[in-house]
């Protein structure tokens, strides 16, 4: 069964600003996530420690000597929500992950909150 992979609306705008070859690379990894879902593990996916969401993960890949990390989490509807990403190469690791996780947590909270009105309508 294929899994749904969606972009948080803020990440979608950031994705559109990326170079097209980098977009293609990210989409190729998103397809792996779509196929394997939560069973996709290292080295492609790893848990993000320090997030307030126990299911917060990072999609990991290299592109043109850059080390990319994309934070995502599975929501209650079983969709992988891509939240934020960036090149962690050449920057302080603690600072990179602190910013990545803070943004991912905030965006995932927003996403979960947006699902609640839908649940009330049922």
Descriptions of predicted regions:
Residues 1-67, 76-80, 87-122:
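Basic, Lys/Arg-enriched alpha-helical interface segments
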């Amino acid at each position: 069964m294929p899994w749904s992979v969606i972009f948080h609306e803020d990440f979608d705008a950031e994705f559109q600003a990326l170079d097209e070859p980098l977009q293609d690379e990210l989409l190729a990894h998103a397809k792996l996530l779509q196929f394997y879902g939560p069973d996709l593990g290292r080295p492609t996916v790893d848990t993000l420690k320090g997030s307030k969401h126990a299911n917060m993960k990072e999609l990991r890949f290299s592109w043109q000597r850059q080390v990319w990390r994309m934070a995502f989490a599975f929501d209650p509807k079983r969709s992988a929500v891509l939240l934020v990403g960036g090149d962690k190469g050449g920057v302080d690791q603690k600072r990179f992950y602190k910013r990545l996780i803070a943004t991912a947590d905030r965006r995932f909270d927003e996403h979960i909150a947006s699902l609640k009105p839908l649940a009330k309508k049922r």
